[in-house]
């Protein structure tokens, strides 16, 4: 699909950058020779806009071998960022898709500044091409296939091999994020814990990873009472899924991802209202993020050891379901008083984290659609983070900044630990109350990380979008897929 060339050839569409202070850039001047000065007139008349994310279409009318030019406004260079570029190109690729363009090119060097080099631009362009044109996988009987971009050429004076490599990495990042989106959007009667495990196994086999899928009997032998408690009410068997990627000869320095895999959450006996239950098919967004990251890792093969653990079940009501006031024993041996069956994700993660440590994880990053509290605190565009290790958090933060996936650190104080340890009947309670809800959930999970360096990522607000946006349609976003993969890539380079 991707090509790199030094000269512009015949294309249906060519994408060109426009900065506010460079209306007469060398790229525009060169094109304007064929247009006999008409582009400059359009700029002066403001029919070609330099405003951020403005897209101006100009037909060549046979003056060049290119049918149409799409000029992308990027605003002032001083405020130009990777986020600006991602949004602008996302909107551009949506526009190209709507116009049924199959062969497009980008004047890559027109997007290059002192802040962003050609490799950065190539990576982002290939990544965003996939993200911006992602389509929901529906179950409608009258599906209509859209015309898709078949050929995309980067026009640049830079080294072709380096640009091709950047295009490949960007494409893989975008494709894997879309894989995660598709998982999150799937209905719960289709994506059960069993089906999620089958997907994970297929992924592992494709990329020659080791894997384990623990069945209920094996979980009982290992004492995974927290995950098993959540599963008690279900007719669907639980799964503890583990993917093992060996990027080094020695099994050391292992990053452990733990993704919440609750395939549907009714709240259990602490039942959600209808409004709160619809959409809970997406409560396995953490699992999807982890699997998306493992797809990238499998494709790009970084020199880093990684484990991905996914505790998976649904949380439903029945005569056998667990109840408020139950006391359960986790795999770690710690006992938990259940005060809220709708705080089930942290129970599943407790056993998931303990299992990841058993498999050799030296660093832990858990990802979960965990609390409504994080949405109240940070909204729908920022993932909440908590940690017991500032050095590891800084590495996660740097990866998130590189991918433009915003995260914000929430605190853990001793008084928070006291609240989750406040139980007359057990070592911990799973829901100390509404106050500081997001912090309480993260603090509870930290009790199982113990001294292992750990970062918690609550994607309840960022896992899905209520409306269409520059990087995709309404629905799942694939939050944290690219951040997790970038973290591993950076670890592997050290």
Swiss-Prot record:
<protein>
    <recommendedName>
        <fullName>Probable cytosol aminopeptidase</fullName>
        <ecNumber>3.4.11.1</ecNumber>
        <ecNumber>3.4.11.10</ecNumber>
    </recommendedName>
</protein>
<dbReference type="GO" id="GO:0070006">
    <property type="term" value="F:metalloaminopeptidase activity"/>
</dbReference>
<dbReference type="InterPro" id="IPR011356">
    <property type="entry name" value="Leucine_aapep/pepB"/>
</dbReference>
<feature type="active site">
    <location>
        <position position="346"/>
    </location>
</feature>
<feature type="binding site">
    <location>
        <position position="260"/>
    </location>
    <ligand>
        <name>Mn(2+) 2</name>
    </ligand>
</feature>
<feature type="binding site">
    <location>
        <position position="283"/>
    </location>
    <ligand>
        <name>Mn(2+) 2</name>
    </ligand>
</feature>
<dbReference type="GO" id="GO:0005737">
    <property type="term" value="C:cytoplasm"/>
</dbReference>
<keyword id="KW-0378">Hydrolase</keyword>
<feature type="active site">
    <location>
        <position position="272"/>
    </location>
</feature>
<dbReference type="InterPro" id="IPR043472">
    <property type="entry name" value="Macro_dom-like"/>
</dbReference>
<dbReference type="InterPro" id="IPR023042">
    <property type="entry name" value="Peptidase_M17_leu_NH2_pept"/>
</dbReference>
<dbReference type="InterPro" id="IPR000819">
    <property type="entry name" value="Peptidase_M17_C"/>
</dbReference>
<keyword id="KW-0963">Cytoplasm</keyword>
<keyword id="KW-0645">Protease</keyword>
<dbReference type="GO" id="GO:0030145">
    <property type="term" value="F:manganese ion binding"/>
</dbReference>
<dbReference type="InterPro" id="IPR008283">
    <property type="entry name" value="Peptidase_M17_N"/>
</dbReference>
<feature type="binding site">
    <location>
        <position position="265"/>
    </location>
    <ligand>
        <name>Mn(2+) 2</name>
    </ligand>
</feature>
<comment type="function">
    <text>Presumably involved in the processing and regular turnover of intracellular proteins. Catalyzes the removal of unsubstituted N-terminal amino acids from various peptides.</text>
</comment>
<feature type="binding site">
    <location>
        <position position="344"/>
    </location>
    <ligand>
        <name>Mn(2+) 1</name>
    </ligand>
</feature>
<feature type="binding site">
    <location>
        <position position="265"/>
    </location>
    <ligand>
        <name>Mn(2+) 1</name>
    </ligand>
</feature>
<dbReference type="Pfam" id="PF02789">
    <property type="entry name" value="Peptidase_M17_N"/>
</dbReference>
<keyword id="KW-0464">Manganese</keyword>
<comment type="similarity">
    <text>Belongs to the peptidase M17 family.</text>
</comment>
<keyword id="KW-0031">Aminopeptidase</keyword>
<dbReference type="GO" id="GO:0006508">
    <property type="term" value="P:proteolysis"/>
</dbReference>
<keyword id="KW-0479">Metal-binding</keyword>
<dbReference type="Pfam" id="PF00883">
    <property type="entry name" value="Peptidase_M17"/>
</dbReference>
<feature type="binding site">
    <location>
        <position position="344"/>
    </location>
    <ligand>
        <name>Mn(2+) 2</name>
    </ligand>
</feature>
<feature type="binding site">
    <location>
        <position position="342"/>
    </location>
    <ligand>
        <name>Mn(2+) 1</name>
    </ligand>
</feature>
């Amino acid at each position: 699909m991707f090509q790199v060339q030094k000269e512009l050839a015949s294309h249906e569409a060519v994408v060109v950058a426009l900065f506010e202070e460079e209306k007469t850039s060398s790229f525009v001047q060169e094109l304007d020779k064929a247009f006999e000065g008409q582009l400059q007139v359009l700029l002066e008349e403001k029919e070609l806009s330099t405003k951020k994310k403005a897209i101006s279409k100009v037909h060549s009318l046979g003056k060049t071998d290119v049918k149409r030019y799409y000029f992308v406004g990027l605003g002032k260079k001083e405020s130009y960022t990777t986020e600006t570029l991602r949004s602008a190109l996302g909107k551009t690729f949506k526009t190209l898709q709507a116009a049924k363009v199959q062969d497009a090119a980008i004047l890559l060097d027109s997007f290059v500044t002192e802040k962003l080099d050609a490799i950065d631009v190539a990576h982002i362009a290939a990544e965003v091409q996939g993200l911006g044109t992602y389509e929901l996988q529906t179950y409608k009987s009258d599906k209509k296939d859209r015309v898709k971009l078949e050929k995309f050429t980067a026009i640049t004076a830079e080294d072709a091999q380096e640009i091709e490599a950047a295009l490949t990495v960007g494409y893989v990042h975008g494709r894997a994020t879309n894989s995660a989106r598709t998982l999150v959007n799937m209905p719960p009667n289709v994506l059960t814990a069993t089906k999620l495990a089958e997907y994970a196994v297929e992924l592992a086999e494709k990329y020659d990873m080791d894997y384990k899928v623990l069945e209920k009997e094996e979980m009982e032998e290992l004492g995974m009472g927290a995950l098993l408690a959540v599963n008690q009410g279900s007719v669907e068997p639980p799964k503890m899924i583990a993917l093992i990627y060996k990027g080094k000869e020695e099994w050391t320095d292992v990053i452990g991802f733990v993704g919440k895999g609750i395939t549907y959450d009714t709240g259990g006996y602490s039942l959600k209202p209808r409004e709160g239950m619809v959409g809970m098919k997406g409560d396995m967004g953490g699992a999807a993020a982890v699997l998306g990251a493992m797809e990238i890792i499998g494709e790009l093969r970084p020199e880093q050891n990684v484990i991905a653990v996914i505790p998976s079940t649904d949380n439903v009501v029945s005569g056998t379901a667990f109840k408020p006031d139950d006391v359960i024993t986790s795999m770690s041996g710690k006992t938990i008083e259940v005060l809220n069956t709708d705080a089930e994700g942290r129970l599943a993660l407790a056993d998931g984290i303990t299992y990841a440590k058993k498999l050799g994880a030296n660093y832990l990053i858990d990802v979960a659609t965990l609390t409504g509290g994080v949405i109240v605190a940070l909204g729908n565009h920022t993932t909440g983070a908590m940690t017991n290790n500032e050095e590891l958090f800084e590495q996660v933060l740097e990866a998130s900044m590189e991918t433009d996936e915003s995260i914000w650190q929430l605190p853990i104080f001793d008084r928070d630990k006291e609240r989750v340890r406040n139980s007359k009947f057990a070592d911990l309670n799973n829901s100390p109350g509404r106050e500081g809800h997001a912090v309480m959930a993260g603090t509870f999970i930290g009790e199982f990380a113990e001294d292992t360096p750990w970062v918690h990522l609550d994607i309840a607000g960022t896992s899905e979008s209520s409306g269409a946006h520059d990087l995709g349609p309404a629905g799942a976003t694939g939050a944290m897929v690219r951040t997790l993969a970038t973290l591993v890539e950076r670890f592997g380079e050290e």
